[in-house]
Amino acid sequence: MVKILNNLIFVLNCGSSSVKFAILNPDNKKKYLSGLVECLFLSKTYMKWKDLTTEHKKCIGSNLSHKDALNFIFNKFFLEKKDIYKNIVGIGHRVVHGGNKIKSSTLIDDNIIQLIQKAISFAPLHNPANLIGIKTAIEKFPIFAKKNVAVFDTSFYQNMPETSFLYAIPYFFYKEHHIRRYGAHGTSHHYVASEVALILNKNFNSLNVITCHLGNGASVSAVCNGICVDTSMGLTPLEGLVMGTRSGDIDPSIIFFMYQKLGMSIDEIHTILTKESGLLGLSGISSDFRYFEKKYYFEKKARLAVDIFCHRLSKYIASYMSLMENNLDAIVFTGGIGENVPLIREITLSKLLLIGFKIDTQRNLGIKNGKHGLITTDKSRPAFVIPTDEELAIAQETIKIIK
């Protein structure tokens, strides 16, 4: 029997249609349990989980809500595995948006819950789900009522300069309504930046790196001397790169045109830009990058969608070079696409030859499915693939806060 160490953290990440969870030791980085409940609100809801030795998958019901999924997780893993439960010392929650008031990870109390509630308009798909996770955890585990910690995606961007976070609209809207760029995926960007600092044997406070979190949602961040100085997502996670179903950057006049000339409602336009655009909108077929990887050389629309994705990504990377004080240590690719699609990394870096990046084809092709490492030639500026581990990052923040 494997000995369970003390100081375990239970991590919850409630997404718009899924619940990720993990139980791990933030000191030795060992995961005793990790899992995902997906396809919430659909005809079949599945749970995949992995303990120290075995992977499992099963259908756990139909049309399940976040609360249903959480109840299933709690009943299965905490009632059955009491040896794990008794060693848990706190619960860490991923929260997408902290609004303008919350600057860093924090213990959760009624005031923090209210502030997360107020920020729902900035993250309407995620913050409500995050709140369900928080409230359910407090209800199920009153013993940890004062040991729930919120770790915010937006915290990493709180030190960005005004030149990066302000929009060129009347200042009144920032002062009175807090309209500014907040960013997202901050926990992931911070984690992989910290990891590449270790690889390069650099103090984090002197690190200059551009991190690319590429998944169904995608963003780029510029870290200069250990501080994030710019990022591609804005007031909401709609701004920036081309994404799975999100448009990313567009001319705002497109919205006026759709409303005034095409007679579309604001809700219809919002749905199009967030759920029907990006790779799905360009191809008319899919938002799944596995499809684009297979069809890139054979279908015109698939190729066009990928090329537009990489075009936008390479432009952001190149523009962030100007923020690096003439010294860029590395680029990092992470996220489901960044870690597992060599094609995207190759196309993107091929556009950055002028600034010193040259792909090593064999290295690049060999790094996916959880592997990490260098993907450029030895004489090139370095680019790395580093798998993100948001659960570990959240656990490390949680143990730091509760201690």
From Swiss-Prot:
InterPro entries per the UniProt record, alphabetical: Ac/propionate_kinase (IPR004372), Aliphatic_acid_kin_short-chain (IPR000890), Aliphatic_acid_kinase_CS (IPR023865), ATPase_NBD (IPR043129)
Record's keyword terms, sorted: ATP-binding, Cytoplasm, Kinase, Magnesium, Metal-binding, Nucleotide-binding, Transferase
Catalytic-site annotation from UniProt: 153
Residues given in the record as Mg(2+) binding sites: 13, 390
CC cofactor note: Mg(2+). Can also accept Mn(2+).
Cellular location(s): Cytoplasm
Biological or metabolic pathway of the protein: Metabolic intermediate biosynthesis; acetyl-CoA biosynthesis; acetyl-CoA from acetate: step 1/2
Pfam families: Acetate_kinase
CDD domains (UniProt xref): ASKHA_NBD_AcK_PK (cd24010)
Binding residues annotated for substrate, in chain numbering: 94
GO biological process, alphabetically ordered: acetate metabolic process; acetyl-CoA biosynthetic process
Residues bound to ATP: 20, 213-217, 288-290, 336-340
One of the record's GO molecular function terms: magnesium ion binding
Site-annotated residues for Transition state stabilizer: 185, 246
Cofactors named for this entry: Mg(2+); Mn(2+)
Complex formation: Homodimer.
NCBIfam families, alphabetized: ackA (TIGR00016)
Family according to the record: Belongs to the acetokinase family.
HAMAP family in the record: Acetate_kinase
Record-given protein name: Acetate kinase
Organism: Buchnera aphidicola subsp. Schizaphis graminum (strain Sg)
